[in-house]
Amino acid sequence: MPWWGDLHPSPESQPNNCPPGLRSESPDADSTIRAMSSSHVPAHHLPTVNALSPLDGRYAAKLSALRPLMSEQGYMHRRVQVEIAWFIALSDAGFAEFKPLSPGARTYLMNLVKNFSEADAMAIKEIEKTTNHDVKAVEYWIKSKFEARPELQNAGEFVHFACTSEDINNTSHALQLKSSRDLVLLPALDKVIAKMREMAHAFADEPMLSRTHGQTASPTTVGKEIANVVVRLQTARSKIAAIPLMGKMNGAVGNFNAHLSAWPAFDWEAFSKKVIETPEPLGLGLTFQPYSIQIEPHDYMAELFDAVARTNTILIDWSRDVWGYVSVGYFKQRLKAGEIGSSTMPHKVNPIDFENAEGNLGLANALLRHMSEKLPISRWQRDLTDSTVLRNRGVALGYAVLAYHALNVGLGKLELKREALQDDLNSAWEVLAEPIQTVMRRYAVAGAYEKLKEVTRGKTVTAEDLHGLIRSLAIPDAEKERLLAMTPASYVGMAAELARRV
């Protein structure tokens, strides 16, 4: 059974709690709104049509892999994991007051993490109604699980020992980000990269007219233009994957004050480092942060979110470009039976996947960039402004993952329209002014650039115009023949070779 649950917020259950701004002067309309607001369905079981966020509403099914990792329940699960890892490590530290745990107790504790369920999460939420403190609720829940085992019950005060809430939170954040990055974000991005690499190879030899400043320019190939994006994405992906995810467990202001008050001679820094860097499940598998205030500085998060945002910016650029290629007819989109493109124009086949991706990438970047700017800033030894922002990490990543899925779907619908590509090339003979003047320069023909400018700039140029000019040039006959054989479609340089390299 999965240990996560739905994340759909519940409307107020009392009819008179309908917001005044939604009330109508009409009794019938008002009663309808009250009826809509009086659902008694538990918040975690609401249908998606009642979700406030489209990530848990319209797009919920597309984010089923991310939800268990970045939801509040996922956050609770990681907190339990951190508390248990710290507790077990303390039992192995050699303290006379806390003997090593038996194998049975260790297995029991590890199973609390492994089998963490929706019911467990709801039990913690119930405790939080009394404590009004989410981390303390986790601590009390763990202690409640010790009641049936005297060995653990006697050691209950070592749960959350010497820890500040942020020791548990920051490591949980890092664990969430690690799993989300490695198990969801990067695999979704990899699918886009793989599909685009496949297209770059398939279309490596398909000539295409370039446009710089929106005007005709030296031809390329479709595959080479896709390869450009693939290389950018590969570089961006490697940066995301390489960022170390940090964790600190050093107390209320980062100095091990409480720890040393209990055992002054113990090497708490080395102990903390071991818990943080030992691979899961015995440790946390993170990178140790030795210097902090109450909170981990969040610099690694800023770096991670900036790296994801830069990747998204590359994909926004590509989404707009491929949208344009569809618009001018270089690509058509495969039809899907039953789909409708417009409520009034039956002929429409819109590039909705690329538009959806562009919009969601923009939303992701707005959040990611806010977090990368805000999170490294905290007043003195800490303030709470980071807490509410951090709860939106999953939202930011959710919009990014959603966009990657949309791009992958959109790319899979594309079919190349070679006739449109060829038509554009055949109407742009002026682009051969570049190779002609370059060969003229090789043979020291005076004013080569200026002569071609006079013939081509702002004019409609035909093959015959250029061929007449070529024949009149004082260059070797072999060079004339080479230039005469050239067409806009053949003048692509090493584009095909470059496309195949990626």
Question: Which ranges hold each PLM region?
Answer:
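Tryptophan (W) side chains
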Residues: W3-W4
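A helix-coil-helix interface module used to build multimeric assemblies
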Residues: S37-H259, W263-E277, G341, F354-N356, ...
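Short amphipathic alpha-helical segments with heptad-repeat character
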Residues: K178-L186, D190-I193, R197, A227-V230, ...
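Glycine-rich cofactor/substrate-binding loops
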Residues: S37-H77, E128-N132, G329-F331, S342-V502
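Acidic, glycine-rich loop-and-beta core segments that form the ion-binding/anion-interacting portion
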Residues: D267-F354, E358
